[in-house]
Amino acid sequence: MSMSGFMVDLPECVRRVEGVSGLPALEVLGPRSSGVVQLHGGQVTSFVPRGGRELLWLSPLAQAGPSTAIRGGVPVCLPWFGAGRDGGLSPSHGLARRARWRLHSVREEGEAVIVSLVVTPEAVAQLDGAEHWPLGLFATLEITFGDALGLRLVVRNEGSDPLTFEAALHTYLAVDDVRTVRVEGLTGASMLDQASGERSRVEGDLTFDGEVDVVVTAPKQPITVVQGRTEGRTPIYRIERENLPDAVVWNPAEQKTASLADVPDDAWPRFVCVEAATIKDDAVTLTPGQDTALGATYAPLAD
């Protein structure tokens, strides 16, 4: 099977399907979980553990294209986050989530299915903002479909000069109602409110009584997402991070959702973004020939 110039043999549990906006995608039907990976953005848009329910939220209005990132799933923010450390870069959250990634390999390890994708400077060359992509930056994303969803991003500097980048796994987690969700494991960490610019320490669990858009620096491991604040309190997701020291927590609430064309007005209670990141002061610099591995595991805790 040829996909974006790569000859890849697919196991029986993986097949090519039509993805968002009719673009190529892979459907994984593994022993422990199933899901979908879009080549646009190298983006996981579905993960369902065996006998469980969907982990990820995907907007029913999601679109994909050279100027459009898919709303939902796990967008890969690279090589900058937001407008970048200096606030002047565009498009928001970098070019990786708008690029056509190439399939490198699919393999089975025990009861896990692992999909590997790559993105190169050539893949972004025709995109708006391509001049801001470091010429030596190459990245591989390894997606593991097991009992948990594993993502491992390896960034390499194949150029002749040092390069600096930010990265985030902008995961949209599906929830019953964000207004009854708590995010645990952040207490005591430094927090930047991106809306107000105020810095503070996290006191207690994060809850959602309006728009939340915060960057939490170096929270403890793990982070747990809990549905229900008092009676019926149920831990639903556990998040472990590798070389991603920061956490970004976001929900637009009703007012901000009105300005998001690809999010239905009534959809905001159904997701919360808990992102594993290395951004702002934690941006990574690679010398020529150097690489680094960044990762996160999202484990479902309840059916």
Regions found by a protein language model. Name each.
Residues 1-71, 222, 226-243, 288-303:
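Beta-strand-rich N-terminal accessory domains
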Residues 37, 153-159, 300:
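Asparagine-centered strand-capping/turn motif at beta-strand->loop junctions
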Residues 57-59, 77, 235-302:
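Active-site pocket scaffolds in enzymes
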Residues 90-146:
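Extended, loop-rich substrate-binding clefts of extracytoplasmic carbohydrate-active enzymes
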Residues 122-124, 158-160, 176, 301-303:
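Short coil/turn motifs at secondary-structure junctions
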Residues 139, 149-151, 292:
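Hydrophobic core residues within well-ordered beta-strands of beta-rich domains
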Residues 162-164, 168-247:
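Active-site/ligand-binding surface loops and adjacent short beta/alpha elements
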